[in-house]
């Protein structure tokens, strides 16, 4: 494909036009009085949202140079979303401010490399100051405040707070679409996997069609059980203990399944057979998780173990197991705490190392099941458009809340960035490095300025007053009042604010040091000649 090139000022100005188009579409959403953006969807109803990264991902510009500029800011939003899960609009506003101010200085003759050094220096000091001003999230109310501010909805904050209280900070909280109008919270305690009983005759409660096992033994194996004789010695030991047994195997079939059902119906013993969860390597890993949680030994050929030789001390135990047609839930497994903690640490390491979003999601689910449970927030709304918008807001709020628990909180509404202004202004530098520091100083005020403008106020007036205010005191754009942001619960997670600033600075520095841009020339579709026809035909 043929390429076209642009150099120096021409290249940067073309990319700046793309930056501005994307940033201008995103920044109208920031703050409590921010607006929504409507996104056209080819095969479904339009999506109405105020989620920065969702808007940024939709933007594709016709001009290749402008599109490259837009893609750079998209990268800021994506990276911030990936690391912190929220703050994408703030990151976009910061990036635009740094790029615009930096480009003015480059055009005036400043050296981009010196500017980059100044930007890096200023951001390092700003991040250190943010951490100094950060406060730990201590209780349920503070967690609810973070969620409520992010979603602009107190009810959502409350749901997230309750969910985190029940499943722990490492617990999985999933967001699903509900068929009703109301949003609800449902918590599944213990380890649950999506496999049910292999025969309805195994149920203990025929009204609910549920098998409930109290203090059961748990057999965990990756083998297929076809012969009843293979497990008979083990079942005889279980019968003597007068306790039920849950059999988790690759499959229980034929003679083995028939005899388990017959003995259950005769009242000889209570046994429930379920298929092992997952597939392939993931199945082995999930069986190991279950074994560690319950204190069982996985009966597998990999370890040279055979079902005929299995003894009762190879079985796991739990306080309760509930099996439905579709799911099995193991509550309060009796596994060794140290082994469980070691497994949790191992999973956390794998989550950090993996580059696949799908693998990360599955690892997080496994971590949650070991750590305590799964909470499901079922989102309800009156229309599909409202449902999708509400779901996006809840996802952002959940990510914000997790970030707050991890690194603490700072004053919200852009106040935290202005609070570090003084520290950054004290940096001693000269020449282009000093100019780079000044670029960051101006950008630190950009989010507050935009929040004020979205509320119909003069941003410059708000910024100047905020610079002279006590640390933590800020402008509440929802009520047009000056308040102590932390006391009022108007907070941002430190991680979100930090990530937004760092990623914006990184992309701005790359932009300013760009001297040439190479783009593909779009191929023109030549009109196809008319097909020749028979005489007399058109």
Curated annotation (Swiss-Prot):
GO molecular function: ATP binding; ATP-dependent protein folding chaperone; isomerase activity; unfolded protein binding
Keywords: ATP-binding, Chaperone, Cytoplasm, Isomerase, Nucleotide-binding
GO terms for cellular component: cytoplasm
TM region positions: none
Entries under Pfam families matching the protein: Cpn60_TCP1
Binding sites annotated in the UniProt record for ATP: 29-32, 86-90, 413, 476-478, 492
Gene3D superfamilies in the cross-refs: GroEL, GroEL-like equatorial domain, TCP-1-like chaperonin intermediate domain
Subunit description: Forms a cylinder of 14 subunits composed of two heptameric rings stacked back-to-back. Interacts with the co-chaperonin GroES.
Protein name, entry field: Chaperonin GroEL
């Amino acid at each position: 494909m043929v390429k076209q090139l642009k150099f120096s000022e021409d290249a940067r100005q073309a990319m700046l036009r793309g930056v501005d188009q994307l940033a201008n579409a995103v920044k109208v959403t920031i703050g409590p009085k921010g607006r929504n953006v409507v996104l056209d969807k080819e095969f479904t109803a339009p999506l109405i949202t105020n989620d920065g990264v969702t808007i940024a991902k939709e933007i594709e510009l016709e001009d290749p140079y402008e599109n490259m500029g837009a893609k750079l800011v998209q990268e800021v939003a994506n990276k911030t979303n990936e690391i912190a899960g929220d703050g994408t609009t703030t990151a976009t506003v910061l990036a635009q401010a740094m790029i615009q101010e930096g480009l003015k200085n480059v055009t005036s003759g400043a050296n981009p490399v010196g500017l980059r050094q100044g930007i890096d220096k200023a951001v390092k000091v700003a991040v250190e100051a943010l951490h100094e001003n950060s406060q730990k999230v201590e209780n349920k109310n503070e967690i609810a405040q973070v969620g409520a501010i992010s979603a602009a909805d107190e009810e959502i904050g409350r749901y997230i707070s309750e969910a985190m209280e029940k499943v722990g900070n490492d617990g999985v909280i999933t967001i699903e679409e509900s068929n009703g109008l109301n949003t609800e919270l449902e918590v599944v305690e213990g380890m649950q996997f999506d496999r049910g009983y292999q025969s309805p005759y195994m149920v203990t409660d025929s009204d609910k069609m549920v098998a409930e096992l109290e203090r059961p033994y748990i057999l965990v194996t990756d083998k297929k059980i076809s012969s009843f004789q293979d497990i008979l010695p083990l079942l005889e030991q279980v019968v003597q203990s007068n306790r039920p047994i849950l059999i988790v195997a690759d499959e229980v079939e034929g003679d083995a399944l028939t005899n388990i059902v017959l003995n259950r119906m005769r009242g000889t013993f209570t046994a429930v057979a379920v298929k092992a969860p997952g597939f392939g390597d993931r199945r082995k890993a999930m069986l190991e998780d279950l074994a560690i949680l319950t204190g069982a030994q996985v009966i597998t050929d990999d370890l040279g173990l055979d079902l005929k030789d299995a003894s009762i001390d190879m079985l796991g135990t739990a306080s309760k197991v509930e099996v439905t047609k579709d799911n099995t839930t193991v509550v309060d497994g009796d596994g060794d705490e140290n082994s469980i903690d070691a497994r949790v640490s191992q999973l956390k390491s794998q989550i950090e190392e993996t580059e696949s979003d799908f693998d990360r999601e599955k690892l997080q689910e496994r971590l949650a099941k070991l750590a305590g449970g799964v909470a499901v927030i079922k989102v309800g709304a009156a229309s599909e458009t409202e449902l999708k918008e509400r779901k996006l807001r809840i996802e952002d709020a959940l990510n914000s809340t997790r970030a707050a628990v991890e690194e603490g909180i700072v004053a919200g509404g852009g106040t935290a960035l202005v609070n570090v202004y003084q520290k950054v202004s004290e940096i001693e530098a000269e020449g282009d490095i000093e100019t780079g520091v000044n670029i960051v100083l101006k950008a630190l005020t950009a989010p507050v300025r935009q929040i004020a403008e979205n509320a119909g106020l003069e941003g410059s007036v708000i910024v100047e007053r905020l610079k002279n205010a006590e640390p933590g005191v800020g402008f509440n754009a929802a009520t047009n009042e000056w308040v102590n942001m932390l006391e009022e619960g108007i907070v941002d997670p430190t991680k979100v604010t930090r990530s937004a600033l760092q990623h914006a600075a990184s992309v701005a520095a790359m932009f300013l040091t760009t001297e040439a841009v190479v783009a593909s020339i779009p191929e023109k579709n030549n009109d196809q000649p008319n097909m020749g026809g028979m005489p007399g035909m058109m």
